[in-house]
Amino acid sequence: MEESPPKQKSNTKVTQHEGQQDLNTTRHMNVELKHRPKLERHLKLGMIPVVYMKQGEEILYPAQSLREENLIQNFTSLLLLQKLCPKDPENMVRKSWASCVPEEGGHMINIQDLFGPNIGTQKEPQLVIIEGAAGIGKSTLARLVKRAWKEGQLYRDHFQHVFFFSCRELAQCKKLSLAELIAQGQEVPTAPINQILSHPEKLLFILDGIDEPAWVLADQNPELCLHWSQRQPVHTLLGSLLGKSIFPEAFFLLTTRTTALQKFIPSLPMPCQVEVLGFSGIERENYFYKYFANQRHAITAFMMVESNPVLLTLCEVPWVCWLVCTCLKKQMEQGRVLSLKSQTTTALCLKYLSLTIPDKHRRTQVKALCSLAAEGIWKRRTLFSESDLCKQGLDEDAVATFLKTGVLQKQASSLSYSFAHLCLQEFFAAISCILEDSEERHGNMEMDRIVETLVERYGRQNLFEAPTVRFLFGLLGKEGVKGMEKLFSCSLHGKTNLKLLWHILVKSQPHQPPCLGLLHCLYENQDMELLTHVMHDLQGTIVPGPNDIAHTVLQTNVKHLVVQTDMELMVATFCIQFYCHVRTLQLNMEKQQGYALISPRMVLYRWTPITNASWEILFYNLKFTRNLEGLDLSGNSLRYSVVQSLCNTLRYPGCQLKTLWLVKCGLTSRHCSLLASVLSAHSSLTELYLQLNDLGDDGVRMLCEGLRNPVCNLSILWLDLYSLSAQVITELRTLEEKNPKLYIRSIWMPHMMVPTENMDEEAILTTFKQQRQEPGDKPMEILGTEEDFWGPTGPVATELVDRVRNLYRVQLPMAGSYHCPSTGLHFVVTRAVTIEIEFCAWSQFLDKTPLQQSHMVVGPLFDIKAEQGAVTAVYLPHFVSLKDTEASTFDFKVAHFQEHGMVLETPDRVKPGYTVLKNPSFSPMGVVLRIIPAARHFIPITSITLIYYRLNLEEVTLHLYLVPNDCTIQKAIDDEEMKFQFVRINKPPPVDNLFIGSRYIVSGSENLEITPKELELCYRSSKEFQLFSEIYVGNMGSEIKLQIKNKKHMKLIWEALLKPEFKFDHLCDQEFCTILKNIMISPAGDLRPALPRIAQALKDAPSLLHFMDQHREQLVARVTSVDPLLDKLHGLVLNEESYEAVRAENTNQDKMRKLFNLSRSWSRACKDLFYQALKETHPHLVMDLFEKSGGVSLGS
């Protein structure tokens, strides 16, 4: 193997460990053989790492020439999360845990996208804020932007001049002019000041550490125009720049720890927020190759870290990664065996001090160094003069030692000193607080002074986010106290130290809800007693929101927390185990719908990818579960290695998990051998949920082997039995018989719908009679017969009272039983009564309750009003497919939404298709089903297919829907399709029962254009847009066949044949409209006389004009973006000459007028293309025009 090239010189010497005997020659040889492919790849590419230091900032890159290296590739390893643009700039803070599902946090980006369109506003930002935890790599990222721009690899077309400022250095200046400021931001002058300032829109100002100095950057003179040579206070100059009173066109990149910038930049405009999340998994390993010059040392060090999941997770933070590498390097230099058992950042810092600082300086000089650090933190200072060092009692020998070991750095430009990293300064400041408190021993007064100083420096809201406070918690833990006592050869009083922690908690907690910051502090402390006590007290701090109308117990039953990084995942899972009010932990990925649990739980959300390292640290923390009894990983795709790690944890003696949900995790028979090994071990697992996985017969047989083991404690196993062979099902039943405590459940299995024959009250009529005209008010509209209520005297017409509210009225003439086939509603009344029925949307009510977490909507929602006592029974429809003619009422509930809140009522009976309430009280009400974890996706439902045909002369277009059998959804789809001149073709529903969340393939005869070809069966409220496939047929000269198949098994679940009965090619517009008034699509797929509501809609149309002609004035005035519309028409309707003629007009209104002038010669087909393009570019405008015109326009 080639030798690494010699290391280049740097400003700070990095001691080489060359020629020293290997710690273990055999181990090094084995390591080298294992990693040889990676080493050869690095050598081939010239990726031999070197560490460069520049003014205290560690810059890492391979030893290639600057001309050849690709800066973007080498430095974009940090994970960047672009956040959604906040609606309120004062709310730009990290969310704490809450009782509601968090909104999506954003998406991952590359460094090239920093000034790209914001995902919230779609506008390119002028201000980008790089935020992140301490030591996460913000400054490195900012310097990279400047350097990559200089090398011509980043934003070269965007900016002519880029200026970099370290705010810690900038704060040393009293006054500066704009010219002097710009000069400081350049390494060498690049152009005269007048030339630079002539194009402010091409300037980028990078302000690193904007929150570090103690300043308020207020724009004190917003209307004052200053000359570029006029000097003024630095904070005023920066405030004017950020406030846009100077160079409003300029761009800014700020780095900060906190997002609460409004406090010291009052005039800050709405920014684009990007959070730095640290190293990815592969970059943690790459860092070791960049840090250690000797490849063998790099491999040895990383293997030691990789074997410790906690240490590997800590290395996600670049500064901590440097700390780990430095400690290991010191051990190599001192000839020690590599050993690093630290579990926290605090412990790593103590280890660092013990390895780097000689004993002779620890007692006095380190204390002086701590005092220097503390004074700087309280005064927001990071640069110190020689007099500052002397003032604290630091002698020259000690300063030289601190410089040599890298604790301090000397700034060549300003002859001042700084700590190697701000985090290191904060660590020394925390030590100062403890030593000062221990020496003073002034009791509560001294503690109050320390806490008030911390609050004054960081603020109550951000107290737990401050590294100094986190280090305090770590140092005051049992291990931290031992480390300090050993380091400083002193005795610290445990009770006094514990009091200091309680002072911090008492001062801050009333002002701050539970958050990740507090969990970080508790994690650093590691004290079991403190963790248990604090986590127990958190239960009382979470209260329901003002809009929550459900019971408080439901609100506090679930906590939601966003964890973006492995570090946050580790901290959260470690602390949650001490939270006695949480019994189950659930992990949800981005855009994944949560699976409901019935036990009190914590739901962790993650918008960033979950890697193998993420799973490793999660399972590592679950080896000792304490209060946790359940783990739900449903919906997460689990690799074989992940399931292997999970099973290793389940077999660990300290793991007390009893319930495990692995629903829809992509498991196969290969994973079953691992799960079987857990069942055969002395694990505490009693319930296992494996639905929606393709386990197969072989996989289930492996599980049976585990179940047969006498030590198996499992009592409940959930499986999908319908996909298994009869032989395997028999084997499972035999197991149940031999083991009375074992219950294998799979009650929701596909089966045929049970017919409702021989049921007097519930008989569904299959023929329709001629509708009777009832006397009444003229404004009321009589509906078709399928909406009638059928009773003892025949059909009773339903009257439409309010189309917008979907409010209907029916006057039942006498006592008896009345049933409406189209809605499924059924009333039993004792006398004549008038009933009002309003179709409601579940989304109006469910969003205010936690009902969705524990129950599933299984029917329409009605607001029914009737005279008290007149209705003795109401039959409410549901679409759950029941196997038996009479089902248990235990899981079915009727949800009532009343003024004081929500009430769940148990029905008197549950039958296929409906539930029965006797002597009901009315309010908005509908049927819901109580669900167990993840059962939502394997409950069989009855569904319907809806096909709509567009009334158009020259083409045939169909819309195909697959939805649950809910009349409110069907009504909403009917209304929506009618707006666009689509009418329904009645076809039978699917024969088999289907499942929510399953996907189905739509196919048909040749030459059909189907978009999309895949449909997901999902329940969406009637107020939401429903999923459908659009099928373009063209000229329908012959019959066409449509099919729907299950995507997983490709089983045919529905099929229909459509036959053409009329051809319209030869008809003129007037003839077509005459036919249009008298047609609709029949159940058999042919054409028959229309129902009155369709004919009435056509009669009410303002004219028989095309949509484009009807709404010409509105379209000219309201189309706000014409160019996208023209792009869609180009080549189809507009030739090149017409396209350019319209674009040449100055305003959007003139462009639309020009377009309408050209449209005089267009055919109906061309106008249809215009309409389709308009619908794609301005959908809300089209819908608004339809609604205002009564919902009908022809030719569209």
From Swiss-Prot:
Tissues/organs with expression: Expressed in macrophages.
Region ZU5, annotated ranges: 789-922
E.C. number(s) listed in UniProt: 3.4.-.-
Localization annotation: Cytoplasm, Cytosol
Keyword Nucleotide-binding assigned: yes
InterPro entries: CARD, CARD8/ASC/NALP1_CARD, DEATH-like_dom_sf, FIIND_dom, LRR_dom_sf, NACHT_NTPase, NLRP_HD2, NLRP_Inflammasome
Site (Cleavage): F922, S923
Gene Ontology BP terms: innate immune response; pattern recognition receptor signaling pathway; positive regulation of inflammatory response; positive regulation of interleukin-1 beta production; programmed cell death; protein catabolic process; proteolysis; pyroptotic inflammatory response
Domain (CARD) ranges: 1106-1189
Additional remarks: Three tandem Nrlp1 paralogs, Nrlp1a, Nrlp1b and Nrlp1c, have been identified. Nlrp1c is predicted to be a pseudogene. Neither Nlrp1a, nor Nrlp1c are expressed in anthrax lethal toxin susceptible strains, hence neither of them is thought to play an important role in this phenotype. In macrophages and dendritic cells, NLRP1 inflammasome activation of CASP1 and IL1B maturation can be dampened by direct contact with activated effector and memory T-cells. This effect may be mediated by hexameric TNF ligands, such as CD40LG.
Name under which the protein is recorded: NACHT, LRR and PYD domains-containing protein 1b allele 5
Organism of derivation: Mus musculus
Gene name as annotated: Nlrp1b
